[in-house]
């Protein structure tokens, strides 16, 4: 039994990606980002839609839990590249899917995710993990790939919030797609 795909709205960018036609087995990582601005998921997709921006992401998860797709999964979004300085030995744009979480600012100027955003992100990550057979140790923050302060709420709050997110996606995946057990065939009495 597979994890059910959450509802995803689509506005696929015409310019901000590499047309790579990746095979499913080439996708080895999921990378979590934060938008770093207060716009919603649909607004971000529109921003990347038809004007060259030099960056992109496959998905945006909005404040109310809505999910928008901006780049096809088999194409390469430009979400975790650098000018050549990587912390992670293997994760790159070419073998990962990028997911941007929309954020809000609190009274102290700190970015945070709404509960709806976190819940929808857990569902999307669990679905993508199941679809591409990706283990939790291959779910990374942009910070883990390049050292960039992204997703800022996960980095600022240390590993506690990040560890909780990873635990949540694993638990959701187990609940949404329980392991199949086989029932032995009854045997005929002797």
Predicted region positions:
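N-terminal catalytic cores of peptidoglycan-degrading enzymes
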Residues: 1-92
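Basic/polar, cationic surfaces and motifs that engage anionic cell-wall
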Residues: 2-12, 19-24, 94, 102-190
């Amino acid at each position: 039994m597979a994890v059910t795909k959450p509802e995803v709205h689509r506005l696929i960018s015409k310019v901000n990606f590499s047309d790579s036609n990746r095979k499913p087995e080439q996708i080895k990582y999921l990378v979590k980002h934060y938008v770093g601005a207060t716009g919603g998921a649909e607004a971000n997709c529109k921003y990347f839609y038809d004007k060259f921006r030099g960056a992109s992401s496959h998905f945006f998860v909005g404040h109310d839990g809505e999910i928008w797709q901006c780049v096809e999964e088999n194409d390469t979004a430009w979400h975790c590249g650098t000018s050549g300085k990587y912390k992670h030995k293997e994760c790159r744009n070419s073998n990962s899917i990028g997911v941007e979480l929309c954020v809000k600012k609190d009274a102290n100027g700190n970015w945070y995710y709404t509960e709806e955003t976190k819940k929808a992100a857990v569902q999307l990550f669990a679905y993508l993990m199941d679809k591409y057979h990706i283990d939790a140790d291959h779910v990374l923050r942009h910070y883990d790939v390049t050292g960039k302060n992204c997703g800022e709420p996960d980095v600022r709050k240390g590993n506690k919030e990040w560890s909780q997110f990873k635990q949540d996606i694993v638990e959701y995946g187990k609940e949404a797609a329980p392991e199949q057990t086989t029932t032995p065939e009854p045997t005929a009495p002797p």
